[in-house]
Amino acid sequence: MAIRGRGGDRGGGGRGGGGRGRGGAGGFRGRGGSRGGGSRGGARGASRGRGRGSSRGGARGGFGPRSSKFNDARLADKDEEEDEEEDISEEESNVSEDEIEESEEEDEEEDAQSGQPYMSLLKSFQSATKTKKRKLDHPEEEGPNKVTKTKDDDNSDDEDNEKVTEDVDAVDEPEEDPQDAPLEDLFDEDDDLDDSDPFETHFTAPDEATFQARIKAIQANKWRTDRIAKNSNRIYYNTPETGDSAEQKLPHSISGVGDLKLKQRLAESMAKHTEFDEAEKAVAPLLFNYQDMLYCNRSVASSESIRRMACLHALNHVFKTRDRVIKNNTKLQRDDTLELRDQGFTRPKVLMILPTRQSCVKMVEMICKVAAPEQQENRKRFDDGYVDKSTKFSDDKPEDFRDLFAGNDDDMFRLGMKFTRKTIKYFSQFYNSDIIFASPLGLRMAIGSEEEKKKLDYDFLSSIELVIVDQADALLMQNWEHVEFIFEHLNLQPRDAHGCDFSRVRSWYLDDQAKYFRQTVIFSAFNTPELAELQRLYCHNWAGKARLQAEYPGVIQYLGVKTRQTFSRFDAASIAADPDARFAYFTKAIVPTLVKRAAKDAAGTLIFIPSYLDFVRVRNYFANNPAVESVTFGNISEYADTPEASRARSHFLTGRHRVLLYTERAHHFRRYAIKGVKRVIFYGLPDNPIFYREIAGGYLQKSEQALMLEHGQGHVKVMFSKYDIMKLERIVGTKRAGKMITEQGDTFDFV
């Protein structure tokens, strides 16, 4: 079944889409699509990762059948265009951006399969003994890490010219039988039994009356919310409503390593890092007490601290889990009548969802710093497939852009990691791994497609106890449906036994309650409706959950240029009616002004459009509606290749195109320094407040410096509705945003 792209607008839309194309699995693709499908795991250029060129900004297509080029009815006639294109300077027409490949694919919905009840599964395991043998000898076409070869069209003009590539992340390793696995040494000899350790109270020996009462409240969707102000942060703390009227308090503050219940080995490796910084102090109490967390204050400056805390917590959890299993193995060798429940259905316990291979490299490097392994198996293979030390960007690119896209920016990867006392093993088979690193697309492809001649394989997610989603704001610009698909398939009861010793499986696994014990931690630069909904739908931790976000001063005061900013509010009856209400307001209140200016000089008007679906609607309006026939325009979306974008920028600079339509995802992936901007119209506000500062401030400032615009004569017009409150508060500030949504007036000016 084909897997849809983002559909432009994250909320859906009937059409697939996404800006970043990639070879797909069984017809499903990443952001932008695969050429004709291809088999699972394969991808063009997989051995080096995608890098730039075919990666960022997206492949065109993915929206059903379409013409090869958009026919713009408002452009000058063809002959004039050809003459003028010859005069375009090489500097303007080649803006140092690699070409983005084209792809097309139809979209289909896919329903996630639900887990079967445990007892029926157990009966099926007992009646089908062959299933158990699958762990030892996988056929080549089965398993999430299988070696896969893909026939991927390498030339859009010659579909017969195909190249076979091997998946750099493929693993040709059998699934171990836990009962036949070699004996392992303890990670350290410290005593795990500490009744005050959150690992004990949450997983190993939780109070049954307490967690059962809380699970019952969660199933009835009864949550208690307490808003807590702490420093400059707002903390929304949610706990299951069990009838306790006392105010729920956050976990005790943690100021350093000494306040944590760490394995001795980790405490020694972190001995020099005694004091936590502000970011670490903010996340540590919830993180190490196994509560769900949506942290919305991640920045480039705090990214290292966030990774350190995430990796320390993940390693602490893995080491405690493995040591408990190893110690109990020894006990059972002495007395096999003991009942020791210390594990789940499968071995993987931690899942890290990351946007790029470079993000994975940074997380792995932090794990190595904290764990300090004596040996690293397959490290060279990891470096060859993930590390890219080439310099791709100049220093004038924004810091957050370089942090995300420097290095290997391939967004299709998956990696299993296994720990022993002395060794870290990279590229371990998923069922033999302790930690799984993956991008949403990479993990989606590992799970498989219903169109493939095999069943979906997501049993390796059945016993995940810790999910860490880092740089979630970047994942929003990929195919968010893949993230939702992954969460839908977490902690389902497995369909195969995988050699599991059910006598050692914890009771809450057998009772299908694993999702209530899983901790989910999401790190993002800001909050969005998608992230809030992800936490609402998939975070059911019986210990509670919290959202942390800052009080925003607003970026309008940091534009770096004096300009008039007008915010106009329009009414929408519901969030579903918002797109139509927005378009109606635009055509009635904004377009007439553009038409009047066209008679004089409307050149230099940039219209920023966050949603691709809205972009298509506005573009078609400018191309076909007689009301704007006097307004020439160009457009740059995430699907525009480099020559198209170069022509649009050049024509806009020279004034041939008086209006330029520009999408948020095009800016996210390319960060074009567009020249000639005199006025900016925000059809909608960007999620990322940095984009507002760069476009409303940076573009106008460049025009003033180039003497194309008189000082202070630039103008910014913003359209917003009450459903834009999250975006609005980051732009104008938390205090102003509330007033702008509720006040009777609908126009607000800032200078």
Curated annotation (Swiss-Prot):
InterPro entries, per database record: P-loop_NTPase, UTP25, UTP25_C, UTP25_NTPase-like
Record's compositionally biased regions (Gly residues): 10-44, 54-64
Ranges annotated as biased composition (Basic and acidic residues): 137-153
Keyword Iron: no
Molecular function terms, GO-annotated: rRNA binding; U3 snoRNA binding
Main location: nucleus
GO biological process terms, semicolon-separated: maturation of SSU-rRNA from tricistronic rRNA transcript (SSU-rRNA, 5.8S rRNA, LSU-rRNA)
Pfam families (UniProt xref): Utp25_C, UTP25_NTPase-like
Stretch list, region Disordered: 1-195
GO CC entries: nucleolus; small-subunit processome
Polar residues bias spans: 113-129
Places the protein is found: Nucleus, Nucleolus
Keywords for the protein's UniProt record, in alphabetical order: Nucleus, Ribonucleoprotein, Ribosome biogenesis, rRNA processing
Subunit structure: Component of the ribosomal small subunit (SSU) processome composed of at least 40 protein subunits and snoRNA U3.
Biological function: DEAD-box RNA helicase-like protein required for pre-18S rRNA processing, specifically at sites A0, A1, and A2.
Family the entry assigns: Belongs to the UTP25 family.
Protein name as catalogued: U3 small nucleolar RNA-associated protein 25
